[in-house]
């Protein structure tokens, strides 16, 4: 062997002579901002810049430490010095039939634009708009219109130029953006028969602009709402513009395709947020009574099909969530590219295979609706144009003007600088009054979107057990079934909407008030205009209820059969503040629990009261949701025996079952909250699969924690006083409920 080669072969054996591990230079500070590293200074690490609100990183938001120990050089710029630049909003290029001020080349964050119309024209949209820290104007496009055409004046968004000034049937308008701005929405729109413009509004935005979570969440939240709102052909034919997003008849079927970017620029932590966001969407969709199949595709240089809609397990929420949870970040470890085309092409192949299945009925195939959710952090850089794959998908689904509602593509980009607005816009669906393409600043914003998107305000049918669980929802929105029952102006009891016209409450609320025409039921949030008072058309009190029935036995009060139904004089309009809760043993609850057809009331009880201690809730006087633990089985016995020790209330009681029968659920241990006087009749409820079910109603207790004047102040029980609370168990009063709610609710077999 050559002596020199021999020496070289031995070099790795000596630590002092070993090659040093590569690392990227540390001179990457950003002026005015900060940065984070996904894996230190090692090759493969992603550097992410961040700037204060109202500023953006320039020239890039991320950089990759390459395998040669050098930072990736930003494309399309010679500058490698990172700085935080101030955000600016674009200026109007033109404004028809009116004037605007001030006239600047661009506008700083916080700056205002004011619009005013000429005589004979009416202003539609926002008269004053403010530049927001994300580079977007708040409000809506200002338009001066005289209403003289078949379609309304489509307007000209800030920074846009329009060609076409005729708005009659069949007329077209075209848009382009001024220099350095990016067009999102439809570049061309046509005036249609129904007086609505095709496509979606053209908006011109700065390349570095992004969407706030509070803007994206309502759009996606409405998607879920209208997925449920289209419940039958009659409702579909209504001409109300409800902003239909992902839409499906409950008798139909939805194919949901989740496409998750796993390319090298996505860190492991960020990919976990992608997975978590997809899981939230899946969980929410499966919480409603619709038929859905889910496909999961991850992609980098190549796609990987985790789950196909052709598989039976794609219709099982547990299987879908397990598949999402078990996706391995390292599956695409060697994939450096972002191949959105191949990911969408995999969806196309899946659709084609389903359509050509031997047993697939052509009519049934035509009725399947399809929604594609793309989560990506970058521009497609290999595999060809993703738009080609979208066109193929539209062809196989026969998407035309009449069938446009059968396909929705949502393109969600994360990272305002390295996501291509133009590409996302080309991929997202274009439908009037809707948005399907979004860019969020970072994955944390994406997570916020899926936390806040659960808005049910647009659901017009009385689907049960749906509460708005987003972080910014009011107390009433979280428990929209909760109502207040009062004679004249004094509040005395609570109740729960169980349909759009019936309220379930406690019988003892009415023992001292015979003239029920004076009573009112307040539905909705008293802090909002949506609150409304209803008169009672009919009160159905359980004939078995008589609070003094055991007085001769030395028992001053007995609350057996403490249940009542109230029929309101009018139906309640469904909204985010007013919606019924699910009553167990009904068909609605069976669907919400995802139980099979043929399931029984006993099956519901096993599902909902399946432990000896069950976390549950009731609503306090101030609207807060408070926590209790319902006791069953052996724990029920231990819970109720405390009554024997309360000699103040029951001085001569020897058998606890004389006052606490098996009609009652028991709570009050484990530091539970205790209901106050005035909270009687309210629902005792629990959550399963993002839906809410009433298993009991507040009846009576040994201690009133609200003895003071303030309804916001709850005092702990004094020394020697053991609190216990008892709630009517709705599973024990099924015959009575079925007798009086027949034809109002559909019940499953006992």
Curated annotation (Swiss-Prot):
Q: Describe how it is modified after translation.
A: Cleaved and activated by different proteases depending on the complement pathway to generate complement C2a and serine protease complement C2b chains. Cleaved and activated by C1S following activation by the classical complement system. Cleaved and activated by MASP2 following activation by the lectin complement system. Cleaved and activated by GZMK following activation by the GZMK complement system.
Per the database record, which ranges form the Sushi domain? 22-86, 87-146, 149-206
List, in alphabetical order, the Gene Ontology terms for molecular function in this entry: metal ion binding; serine-type endopeptidase activity
The organism's superkingdom is given as Eukaryota
User: Site Cleavage: which residues?
Assistant: 244-245
The record's keywords, sorted A to Z, are: Complement pathway, Disulfide bond, Glycoprotein, Hydrolase, Immunity, Innate immunity, Magnesium, Manganese, Metal-binding, Protease, Repeat, Secreted, Serine protease, Signal, Sushi
A UniProt-annotated Pfam family: Sushi
User: Where in this chain does the entry annotate a coiled-coil region?
Assistant: none
Q: List the disulfide bonds.
A: 24-65, 51-84, 89-131, 117-144, 151-191, 177-204, 464-582, 493-509, 585-601, 639-666, 676-706
Q: Where does Mg(2+) bind?
A: 263, 265, 338
Which coenzyme or cofactor does it need?
Answer: Mg(2+); Mn(2+)
The VWFA domain extends over 255-453
Q: What is the E.C. number? A: 3.4.21.43
Q: What class of enzyme is it?
A: hydrolase
Would the keyword Protein biosynthesis turn up in this protein's UniProt record? Answer: no
According to the record, which residues are glycosylated? Answer: 29, 112, 334, 468, 472, 652
Report domain Peptidase S1 positions.
465-742
Sorted alphabetically, the Gene Ontology cellular component annotations on this record are: extracellular region
Q: What InterPro entries does the record tag this protein with?
A: Compl_C2_B, Peptidase_S1_PA, Peptidase_S1_PA_chymotrypsin, Peptidase_S1A, Sushi/SCR/CCP_sf, Sushi_SCR_CCP_dom, Trypsin_dom, TRYPSIN_HIS
Motif MIDAS-like motif in this chain: 261-265
Signal sequence residues: 1-20
Q: What does this protein do?
A: Precursor of the catalytic component of the C3 and C5 convertase complexes, which are part of the complement pathway, a cascade of proteins that leads to phagocytosis and breakdown of pathogens and signaling that strengthens the adaptive immune system. Component C2 is part of the classical, lectin and GZMK complement systems.
Entry similarity comment: Belongs to the peptidase S1 family.
Comment, domains: The MIDAS-like motif in the VWFA domain binds divalent metal cations.
PANTHER family (alphabetical):
COMPLEMENT C2, SUSHI DOMAIN-CONTAINING PROTEIN
Q: What is the protein name for this chain?
A: Complement C2
As recorded in Swiss-Prot or TrEMBL, the protein's gene is named C2
